[in-house]
């Protein structure tokens, strides 16, 4: 049968050609003789090799059909060349040492990740629960923010509202992805945190029907509901869901919503415009996401 594809490859031919070149007297090789020795019918394949070797300054043309390996030419064994060769070898050794160090560091990191992910004791410390957060900020209103890297956060100086209370704002701006905000609320040490997204879904602001099961949480300045399961997996991957008071979809207390909506500072704002209103499309560099919408309560 014919020769294999590997035997005809240019890479294998180059290896054989360089071997001939290194064995040639004074490093001078006749290309016609090389083509006959290597049984190459198409001489252009030989020229393809010599063009590359000449381009990287390993050979030079002596005549039309002969080339010379520069490693054996005059001046190739000067002190300058030898010193340069030693420097290059030292650089290679240094790079190989650094590569081994990086490989070792990589193995340590992989083992550390494995210890955290698979060890039963360490596993419970790989996430933060709603209970953990609430215990650190007892009595405060908690907003958990999940935003992509590079998100800009701005907290303007609080302004006094019409009722004499300060109005606080947080402006978040991201150019690389969506920003998700969760309101986490806990009434007392005995109660469990309740969580829902900000702004709340439409069904949270709807009065609950008589057929739905509802639980009225204690009145406070903040109300909350368990985040639906799909939102927990998609929107709050960094926050472990904790069991909370079971509240079916759309069953948050109407009294709590009415109380919040009637207050001077309603903490949850629906930014989607009504069919009759349009968005404000232009933003200056000093404006945040709140300025994109005509939200009067934030513009006092």
Swiss-Prot record:
GO cellular component: cytoplasm; nucleus; RNA polymerase II transcription regulator complex; sarcoplasm
Coiled-coil regions, chain positions: none
Region (Disordered): 191-250
Transmembrane parts of this sequence: none
GO BP of this protein: animal organ morphogenesis; cell projection organization; regulation of DNA-templated transcription; regulation of transcription by RNA polymerase II
Motif DEF box in this chain: 36-73
SMART domains listed in its UniProt record: E2F_TDP
Protein origin, superkingdom: Eukaryota
Pfam families: E2F_CC-MB, E2F_TDP
Biased composition (Polar residues): 235-246
Predominant localisation class: nucleus
Region Transactivation, annotated ranges: 242-300
Tissue specificity of this protein: Found in placenta followed by kidney, lung and brain.
InterPro entries: E2F (IPR015633), E2F-DP_heterodim (IPR037241), E2F_CC-MB (IPR032198), E2F_WHTH_DNA-bd_dom (IPR003316), WH-like_DNA-bd_sf (IPR036388), WH_DNA-bd_sf (IPR036390)
Region of interest (Leucine-zipper), ranges: 31-53
The entry's DNA-binding region: 2-73
Cellular compartments annotated: Nucleus
Region: Dimerization, residue numbers: 74-170
Disulfide bonds: none
Chain's role: Transcriptional activator that binds to E2F sites, these sites are present in the promoter of many genes whose products are involved in cell proliferation. May mediate growth factor-initiated signal transduction. It is likely involved in the early responses of resting cells to growth factor stimulation. Specifically required for multiciliate cell differentiation: together with MCIDAS and E2F5, binds and activate genes required for centriole biogenesis.
Name of the protein this chain belongs to: Transcription factor E2F5
Species name: Rattus norvegicus (Rat)
């Amino acid at each position: 049968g014919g020769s294999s594809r590997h035997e005809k490859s240019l890479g294998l031919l180059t290896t054989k050609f360089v071997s001939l070149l290194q064995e040639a007297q004074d490093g001078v090789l006749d290309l016609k003789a090389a083509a006959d020795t290597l049984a190459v019918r198409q001489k252009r394949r030989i020229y393809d090799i010599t063009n590359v070797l000449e381009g990287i300054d390993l050979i030079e043309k002596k005549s039309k059909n002969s080339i010379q390996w520069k490693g054996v030419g005059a001046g190739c064994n000067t002190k300058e060349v030898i010193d340069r060769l030693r420097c290059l070898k030292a650089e290679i050794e240094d790079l190989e040492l650094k590569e081994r160090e990086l490989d070792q560091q990589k193995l340590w990191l992989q083992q550390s990740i494995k210890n955290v992910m698979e060890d039963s004791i360490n596993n419970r410390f790989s996430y933060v629960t709603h209970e953990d957060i609430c215990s650190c900020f007892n009595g405060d209103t908690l907003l958990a923010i999940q935003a992509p890297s590079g998100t800009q956060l701005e907290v303007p100086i609080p302004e006094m509202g019409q009722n004499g209370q300060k109005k606080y704002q947080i402006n978040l701006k991201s150019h690389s992805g969506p920003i998700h905000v969760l309101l986490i609320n806990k009434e007392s040490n005995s109660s469990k945190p309740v969580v829902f997204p900000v702004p709340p879904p439409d069904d949270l602001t709807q009065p609950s029907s008589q057929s739905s099961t509802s639980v009225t949480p204690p009145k406070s300045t903040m109300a909350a509901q368990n985040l639906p399961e799909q939102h927990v997996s998609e929107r709050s991957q960094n926050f472990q869901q904790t069991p909370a008071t079971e509240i079916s979809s759309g069953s948050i207390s109407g009294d709590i919503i009415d109380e919040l909506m009637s207050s001077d500072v309603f903490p949850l704002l629906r930014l989607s415009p009504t069919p009759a209103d349009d968005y404000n499309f232009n933003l200056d560099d000093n404006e945040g996401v709140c300025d994109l919408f005509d939200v009067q309560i934030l513009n006092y």
